[in-house]
UniProtKB/Swiss-Prot annotation:
<comment type="subunit">
    <text>Forms an oligomeric complex of eight-membered rings.</text>
</comment>
<keyword id="KW-0143">Chaperone</keyword>
<comment type="similarity">
    <text>Belongs to the TCP-1 chaperonin family.</text>
</comment>
<dbReference type="GO" id="GO:0016887">
    <property type="term" value="F:ATP hydrolysis activity"/>
</dbReference>
<dbReference type="InterPro" id="IPR027410">
    <property type="entry name" value="TCP-1-like_intermed_sf"/>
</dbReference>
<dbReference type="InterPro" id="IPR027409">
    <property type="entry name" value="GroEL-like_apical_dom_sf"/>
</dbReference>
<dbReference type="InterPro" id="IPR027413">
    <property type="entry name" value="GROEL-like_equatorial_sf"/>
</dbReference>
<keyword id="KW-0547">Nucleotide-binding</keyword>
<dbReference type="GO" id="GO:0005524">
    <property type="term" value="F:ATP binding"/>
</dbReference>
<keyword id="KW-0067">ATP-binding</keyword>
<dbReference type="InterPro" id="IPR054827">
    <property type="entry name" value="thermosome_alpha"/>
</dbReference>
<dbReference type="Pfam" id="PF00118">
    <property type="entry name" value="Cpn60_TCP1"/>
</dbReference>
<protein>
    <recommendedName>
        <fullName>Thermosome subunit</fullName>
    </recommendedName>
</protein>
<dbReference type="InterPro" id="IPR012714">
    <property type="entry name" value="Thermosome_arc"/>
</dbReference>
<comment type="function">
    <text>Molecular chaperone; binds unfolded polypeptides in vitro, and has a weak ATPase activity.</text>
</comment>
<dbReference type="InterPro" id="IPR017998">
    <property type="entry name" value="Chaperone_TCP-1"/>
</dbReference>
<dbReference type="InterPro" id="IPR002423">
    <property type="entry name" value="Cpn60/GroEL/TCP-1"/>
</dbReference>
Amino acid sequence: MAQLAGQPVVILPEGTQRYVGRDAQRLNILAARIVAETIRTTLGPKGMDKMLVDSLGDIVITNDGATILDEMDIQHPAAKMMVEVAKTQDKEAGDGTTTAVVIAGELLKKAEELLDQNIHPSIIIKGYALAAEKAQEILEGIAKEVSPDDVETLKKAAVTSITGKAAEEEREYLAEIAVEAVRQVAEKVGDKYKVDLDNIKFEKKEGASVHETQLIRGVVIDKEVVHPGMPKRVENAKIALINDALEVKETETDAEIRITSPEQLQAFLEQEERMLREMVDKIKEVGANVVFVQKGIDDLAQHYLAKYGIMAVRRVKKSDMEKLAKATGAKIVTNVRDLTPEDLGEAELVEQRKVAGENMIFVEGCKNPKAVTILIRGGTEHVVDEVERALEDAVKVVKDIVEDGKILPAGGAPEIELAIKLDEYAKEVGGKEQLAIEAFAEALKVIPRTLAENAGLDPVETLVKVIAAHKEKGPTIGVDVFEGEPADMMEKGVIAPLRVPKQAIKSASEAAIMILRIDDVIAASKLEKDKEDKGGSNDFGSDLD
């Protein structure tokens, strides 16, 4: 409602909530900080897990920031921006999702303190933008170059990523799998390497222990051989991939065939059989002894394939067909009649095996496969899911290093270095922006402080010790949460890709700046149905309760 010459003017529908100026900023900052506080306790190797139960009673137990925020049904728009920070970090860097959200929350906390001192949001925004830009430059300066062939360093980065997750006991073993998988599918483009993570397939099966998790240099497909008479094991396999059905197709036109005698019916059936026989003969003729079909296989075609000793699998997913092509070197053929010996792929072994009581097809021993499978095992569904999340993060971290060739110490070391250097930079900038840059630097200390806090250490005492050691010994000094003392993270093998902190600071600062720009929130009243679903409230601020 507005007033013009003493007359109230209604421009928004009834029930609309509006928050202006400091109220709007305070509300948004509070919402974003609540999200950051929620996942702060999961940060680091000693971080705790969260148990999330959805409306159907399904349970997720994890300490992965992106997963936690994805599973939470967050309503507040400013809080949703924090979820986007985690999603962007996960997509771009693969790890550091909790770090990014915690930094964003702390930046907003420090911004609120500046707002309380009557510093204009525009000045804070400018200072934060300058600090974020300078931070990228500082990180580039302290990064160490590493070769994609340095397996030990890649493994250390993978171990750092897995530490603190449910799969921690097997971190060395899982790190080896992650490194081997990425190096196998990496392709050289010019003088750089590119890794397409779509070429690494994750298959999960409950049962056995996490140590039974294995890397298959080929593809594992959750299907079974279509006919009991077919071989279940084929060595020196010649593999055909058919993107069609081994069936007699129905015509597209609504034609009718009038059959007036038994002879005509017999001829019709014989022709159908002949067509199916020709398809199978073609597969045999080109030398294939294993065939994967994206669609169905007629019963008669199955019979002939079994008779010829050809293993066949039907209704294979398109994504699996593409992985089979990359692993075996086969070409996907649309029509069986176009199949040639050159289209066939090769594998040392194709075998149907029972895993956790279910049949699966293993295609192994491919020559230099550009698609691999990680078969994940674990005692329960929750363990298997968390091992998958840990491996996905580890694989992404290794990918970052292989592609960029640069690493940093972890354990809060980069954030401490940034805090020290940005404090110096703030003095060069001067003006009111100096206050914002100093606030940015102070906000970054939340990472080493939280790492210490989550490990049961005194956060203030630990931070003072680490900063003193860092200034004395250099930018690789961070928080050793196991010993409770400052330590050289590079020597300890606690490392991360350069891409992770760079993206975390970029995403966090952009989100904080976006939230600080908002000085007016107009929230329409919810529809009646939504009100019932949400318990009848249409108060925008009530989403924070």
